[in-house]
Amino acid sequence: MRPIVRGNWPTNTAGENIVFTEYQQARGELIKRMGELCSFCEMHLDTSLAVEHVQPKQPIGATAIIAARLLDWHNFLLACTNCNSTKSNKDVILDDYLWPDRDNTYHSFAYSEGGIVNA
């Protein structure tokens, strides 16, 4: 898995943080920085990449969307339909996983000829 650099919050021409009113608006900025690749499986997709929330916007058991997660640039990655749906809406303990935007995942996995992946 390739490491990803999301970078700082995108800014407008005046140097102010861009305000996203919907999380899907971050897609273009994410693609500029990460490319048209799923952050997890690295599949190249030019049209069906979704903005993935690392921490779910409405975790299991929550009665409402958590506003701080919904539009937070640092909570976004790009994901294909399969990877986006696999994670579901469970809260994530970030230190329990390797993340392409936080860890050097390039050397974290070994791929065998038969398709087995070892961490």
Question: Each PLM stretch: what is its role?
Answer:
Residues M1-L37, I60-L71:
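Short, charged surface segments at domain edges that flank catalytic/cofactor-binding sites
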Residues F40-L78, K87-T105, F109:
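Histidine-centered nuclease catalytic patch
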Residues G114-A119:
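Hydrophobic, aromatic-enriched interface-forming segments
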